[in-house]
């Protein structure tokens, strides 16, 4: 619900949309997707549990990669997969989200 609210109330802002469309590649990991994947795409967790749905696999990936399974959780990464700036969670502040995106761009350009 919070992810959809962020998309509807923050991402829909013209300034945010322009930055997202022009300056970022968006990868969304939906944890509520119940689609069962083909067996060749199932994931076995460290504890031996087999994850079959896209949502469960996405949740596991987020937890293993970022140490967090909170939704929404925005991560800005460079091409090397390293964080550009600290991640951001649920916050409906449009100016805050714009600043977050711009800080990621600045960090990216400073690394080049």
Identify the role of each PLM range.
Residues 1-4, 74:
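The canonical Cys-X-X-Cys-His
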Residues 7-57:
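Thiol-based oxidoreductase modules, predominantly thioredoxin-like and allied folds used
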Residues 8-12, 45-54, 61-111:
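Non-catalytic, surface beta->alpha helical segment in thiol-disulfide oxidoreductase systems
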